[in-house]
UniProtKB/Swiss-Prot annotation:
This is Threonylcarbamoyl-AMP synthase. Its main location: cytoplasm. It is an enzyme of class 2 (transferase). Required for the formation of a threonylcarbamoyl group on adenosine at position 37 (t(6)A37) in tRNAs that read codons beginning with adenine. Catalyzes the conversion of L-threonine, HCO(3)(-)/CO(2) and ATP to give threonylcarbamoyl-AMP (TC-AMP) as the acyladenylate intermediate, with the release of diphosphate. The gene is tsaC. InterPro entries: DHBP_synth_RibB-like_a/b_dom, Sua5-like_dom, TC-AMP_synthase, TC-AMP_synthase_SUA5. The keyword Isomerase does not apply. Transmembrane segments: none annotated. Gene3D superfamilies: DHBP synthase (3.90.870.10). GO terms for biological process: regulation of translational fidelity; tRNA threonylcarbamoyladenosine modification. Belongs to the SUA5 family. TsaC subfamily. Keywords: ATP-binding, Cytoplasm, Nucleotide-binding, Nucleotidyltransferase, Transferase, tRNA processing. Residues 1-185 form the YrdC-like domain. One of its GO terms (cellular component) is cytoplasm. The lineage of its organism: Bacteria, Pseudomonadati, Pseudomonadota, Gammaproteobacteria, Vibrionales.
């Protein structure tokens, strides 16, 4: 993985990165760095009320941010059975999670990825990163490094040199408490 160390260093320094996911490039940052989160929202021109997804290499990386005690054992098992994979779950959030991550919600969107390059980033960084599509609001999501450079090249985003997966649709989003599908994947 060509520039993994550069990308992890960028995260540690509070910078925004772009990286390939299952279907499109994402942009993200350290979910515990308020300035990095503000920079990400600025790059995306994204309202802070919308919140962000956390993407991780394992459920263990998500535990500091999510409150599984508010879910039943069956609900937790359903979540675990879908991971790693392209299902994002809305789950109860711990109060220590920064409001810029959750937006206007009292829950948080989380996913354990199966994408090897994102897993490598999260493992090397030691925790999850935020995830939202790598595009300016209103434009199509980027599926290549070239497209990321065209849309976000002048924003200072550090781009991970990798390939997106084979998905043509965004990841499915499901509510852990109700089981309802909020977005088809």
């Amino acid at each position: 993985m060509k520039n993994l160390n550069q990308v992890v260093d960028a995260l540690k320094q509070g910078n925004v990165i772009a990286y390939p996911t299952e279907g499109v490039f994402g942009v993200g940052c350290d979910p515990d760095n308020e300035q990095a989160l503000l920079n990400l929202l600025d790059v995306k021109k994204r309202p802070k009320e919308k919140g962000l997804i956390l993407i991780a290499a394992s459920i263990e990386q998500l535990l500091p941010y999510i409150d599984l005690e508010q879910l039943t054992e069956e609900q937790v098992n359903t979540i675990k059975a879908s991971w790693p994979g392209p299902v994002t779950w809305i789950v109860p959030v711990k109060t220590s999670t920064l409001p810029l991550v959750t937006g206007q919600f009292d829950s948080i969107a989380v996913r354990v990825t199966a994408h090897p390059q994102v897993k490598a980033i999260c493992n090397a960084f030691g925790k999850p990163i935020t995830s939202t599509s790598a595009n300016l609001s209103g434009l199509e999501p980027c599926r290549s490094v070239t497209e990321v450079e065209a849309q976000l090249g002048d924003t200072g985003v550090v781009i991970f040199q990798g390939e997106v997966g084979n998905r043509t649709q965004p990841t499915e989003i499901r509510d852990a408490k109700t089981g309802n599908t909020l977005r088809q994947g």
